[in-house]
Amino acid sequence: FRYRALSPKYNDVYINGAPMNDMESGQFRYSLVGGLNQQTRNVDFALPFENNNFSLTGMAGSNNYDFRAGSMAGGNRITLSGANRNYTLRGMYTYGSGFNSKGWAFATNITYRWANRGYVEGTFYNAFSYFFGVQKKWNNGHSLSFSTWGNPTERASQGASTDEVYWLVNDYQYNPYWGYQNGHRRNSRVVNDFAPAAIFTWDWNI
């Protein structure tokens, strides 16, 4: 989706109020938060030129994800999912403590997504996501929070082709990036991506 057909680089994305768009491409790398479904639920959206409390909104709008441990829903949550697209199975465990009597809050998330073969032939998916956050709040309005997360991923790609090729092989899911080498399946375009991140946030409610 492109708001007003503008490039995604005009959509400003923040985490705890800090800008997170890539400095080279200008776009936000959503693979940075892949698998963190419960964490990315805490988000504020702002339309272009709409007043908000975290940015001078971008031409294609702005999003601000709240990764503070105290903002996560309390309790334990276990999720098991099956799909027939990028991955086949997903397991997720999420924990949030909420603030205790001493003003501490903790949150964690572990997610694993796997596919031996995705929707398209020759594709596989192997991704592990983690999140850990801690926050301390004082009665004088000050709060300190630390969060770290990552999403190491190994996935095989799908290549584009032409109608003529699809007709010749009689398969509209034909993937030119894969084949057999020495009797084993091999994809020539395997993406390995891991960009660990951490953020330290000081809040002072005056």
Summary of predicted features, one role per range:
Residues 1, 5, 55-58, 123-125:
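Short, glycine-/polar-rich solvent-exposed loops and beta-turns at beta-strand/coil boundaries
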Residues 1-19:
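Extracytoplasmic beta-strand/coil segments of soluble accessory domains associated
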Residues 8-10, 38-40, 58-60, 73-75, ...:
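Extracytoplasmic
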Residues 10, 21-22, 50-53:
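Short beta-strands and strand-coil junctions in structured, solvent-facing domains, enriched
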Residues 18-47, 66-68, 72, 173:
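Short acidic/polar hinge/loop motifs at secondary-structure boundaries
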Residues 45-46, 75-79, 113-117, 177-186:
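Extracytoplasmic loops and strand-loop junctions of Gram-negative outer membrane beta-barrel proteins
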Residues 82-115, 119-158, 187-205:
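Transmembrane beta-barrel wall of Gram-negative outer-membrane proteins
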Residues 124-129, 161-171:
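Flexible, surface-exposed loop regions and adjacent strand-edge segments
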